[in-house]
Amino acid sequence: MNNSMDKFSNHVRNILHGFFLTIGTTIAEPSTILPLIVNYFGGSSLLVGFFAALLRGGAIVVQLFAAFQAQTYTYMLPYIRRVFFIRFLAWFFIGVSIILFGKESPKLTLFCIGLGLFIFSFSAGFGAIYFKDIIAKIFSPKFRGKTMAYRQFFSALGGLMSGALAAFILESFPAPQSYGYLFIVSSFIMAFGYLAFATVDEPAKTQTMKKENTFKEFLHNSFALLKSDRELQIQLTTFLLAYAYLISLPFIILDAKTKIDLDGIAIGSLITTQMVGAMLSNFLWGRLSGRGYNKLTANISISLYIVAIATAFIASTLQEYMFIFFIIGGAIDGNRIASGNLILALAPQEKRPVYIALQINIISFGLFFSLLGGFLLHFFNYNVLYTITLVMLFISLYFSTKLKEL
């Protein structure tokens, strides 16, 4: 490792950020606990889908604007620190709202949860641009795959701890107080991760673009870039459709609830199993990515999504649902590493914020696939839900075979 990149201290801080952030956010995991919280307060399957989409994809509306502003920044740390503080407050607010209003005003509680999730996710729209640019500056391409695999390994370990913590709180306190405690405790845990990444050693960017006069001009140039770059188009199509697993994922837990007894221990087991799958898979993803096999990583990850959703058709025991979440845990991490590394390898340094913003904006529309899932489940049934999910995942797998290693 040289003096300007791949510093061990930055490597450790990147890992700590992922570790503590995962412990915190897994408390409201959109595929397990969040649907149960919304369901407890009387929310419909449509609202479950909306909140899951809000938590995962509420940031997309500001991504391009964040990139427009960030084009001339030589340092991103001052800006990402503000994002961290806002996200902490939003998560803490959700917990306090559940405790204050949960028993007496379920509708007000749902509104506060939605507001908190919106602020938490909206602020991440700025943070994602800053974070990826910092990662590209402090780690070389090959070491980047290694550090992100380590990050995801320890993030999964944090998820294991989070599952145990969630099970303990859910079993120790009655609802809805237990839900509020989950958010309050986890907000302080994730704050440790924010502090870790806020102190990385960020070098100045040596190449920046001249900022356009207006945001409208920036949008025009950005989409002209998208039209001219065929490899970017293939990447975006592949990873957008790969998010089709979200059509079904938030509702698998509700399907399971009709077939098995989902007490706090069972819920914690599913969360833990997903994190074990993620943690163990990173041995494979780190090895593949470190050797530059990001295309193969994408191929395998999307195939795992297909296996998981196909299993949901026939699952009827806790063990089968644990298998589903185990497979999905691995697939999510593999897909994240492949998409992140491929876009950073493709983007020129001076255009990196624009490439990142285009990727996140377009792919993040897939985060709203859970809305489609809520609609399908509301008007049809689980078989229709799973079938449409599989069709879209097979299309994603086809496009992933056309990716180029960079």
Summary of predicted features, one role per range:
Residues 1-8, 204-237:
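Juxtamembrane intracellular "pre-TM" segments in multi-pass secondary transporters
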Residues 1-61, 66, 70, 77, ...:
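Helix-loop boundary and gating motifs at the non-cytosolic
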Residues 35-40, 68-72, 95-104, 159-181, ...:
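Transmembrane alpha-helix termini and helix-breaking/packing motifs in multi-pass membrane transporters
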Residues 45-46, 141-150, 264-265, 349-359:
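Loop-to-transmembrane helix entry/capping segments in MFS-fold secondary transporters
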Residues 62-78, 170, 280-293, 377-378:
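Helix-to-loop junctions at the C-terminal end of transmembrane segments
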Residues 78-96, 296-311, 390:
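Structural signature of the two symmetry-related core transmembrane helices
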Residues 96-115, 313-325:
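Helix-loop junctions at membrane interfaces in 12-TM secondary transporters
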Residues 124-139, 334-347:
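Intracellular juxtamembrane helix-capping segments at the cytosolic ends
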